[in-house]
Amino acid sequence: MNNLQTQFPHIAIKLNEPLSKYTYTKTGGAADVFVMPKTIEETQEVVAYCHQNKIPLTILGNGSNLIIKDGGIRGVILHLDLLQTIERNNTQIIAMSGAKLIDTAKFALDESLSGLEFACGIPGSIGGALHMNAGAYGGEISDVLEAATVLTQTGELKKLKRSELKAAYRFSTIAEKNYIVLDATFSLALEEKNLIQAKMDELTAAREAKQPLEYPSCGSVFKRPPGHFAGKLIQDSGLQGHIIGGAQVSLKHAGFIVNIGGATATDYMNLIAYVQQTVREKFDVELETEVKIIGEDK
């Protein structure tokens, strides 16, 4: 795998790169090979090479709704953070995979385009948002997604239309088929800028009041179980404030687990498992993780 630096001298590549620098939890082991393409063509080259040489490939977006285990990740990590262009085409916005969702919502505001207000505080990338059909406060990415350009795991380029992008709660065709998002097209509506700003301000205030933004975290840990709210179940189980190592069930919102200092990915995973077990025993409800967990144990 170290041959990648020789094979692709024009692409930024690091070896044994600590991944804790790239996750919102500030945890995670090292990547064997960490690749940062600057263009779609470079991305396609690396994906095709990994497929041809049977090298394990993992895509890393903004690292926000993600836990990387303490043993790190074998093979190649493809970090698409440098693909950040956002453009307007009439009432549509085209954003590349590495663009931040927050920046895309701000771009829409600046262009007086409405539809992405719900995303103004979601700390993910466009690629990650499409992968899990990210949403908040009654809105989801699939509501405004018109099309997406993706790579298959073999390096084949595909343009998917809205009808092909099946989406459900925290699920998408992109995740199901393990596609690599390159860009996304959103269909928005013209609106007065002050009205868009007012909606964003309202959602930002709600987010700041309810979420533990003062600590590193992986965002909402659990999916909403049918007929329940995960945070309420955790709170009613007496787990709010529970600590394992440096990981704590947030005192501000029980649906979040925060790093109060020196947490490891193992602390997070042990606390997640303890919460799931306790809620199962008390309420006979299975809490399914929304956060993605990848990598190897140490």
Curated annotation (Swiss-Prot):
What reaction(s) does this enzyme catalyze? UDP-N-acetyl-alpha-D-muramate + NADP(+) = UDP-N-acetyl-3-O-(1-carboxyvinyl)-alpha-D-glucosamine + NADPH + H(+)
Q: Any idea of its EC number?
A: 1.3.1.98
Q: Where is the active site?
A: 170, 220 (proton donor), 290
The family database entries (InterPro entries) matched by this protein are listed as: FAD-bd_PCMH (IPR016166), FAD-bd_PCMH-like_sf (IPR036318), FAD-bd_PCMH_sub1 (IPR016167), FAD-bd_PCMH_sub2 (IPR016169), MurB (IPR003170), MurB_C (IPR011601), MurB_C_sf (IPR036635), Oxid_FAD_bind_N (IPR006094)
Q: Which GO terms describe its cellular component?
A: cytosol
Which pathway does it serve?
Cell wall biogenesis; peptidoglycan biosynthesis
Q: What cofactor does its activity depend on?
A: FAD
Question: Which is an annotated Pfam family here?
Answer: MurB_C
Q: Which residues form the FAD-binding PCMH-type domain?
A: 26-191
Q: Name one GO biological process term.
A: cell wall organization
Compartments it resides in: Cytoplasm
Q: Which domain of life is it from?
A: Bacteria
Q: Does the keyword Cell wall biogenesis/degradation belong to this entry?
A: yes
| Molecular function terms from GO | FAD binding; UDP-N-acetylmuramate dehydrogenase activity
Q: Which keywords label this protein?
A: Cell cycle, Cell division, Cell shape, Cell wall biogenesis/degradation, Cytoplasm, FAD, Flavoprotein, NADP, Oxidoreductase, Peptidoglycan synthesis
Per the entry, what this protein does is: Cell wall formation.
Spell out the family assignment given in the record's similarity comment: Belongs to the MurB family.
Q: What is this protein called?
A: UDP-N-acetylenolpyruvoylglucosamine reductase
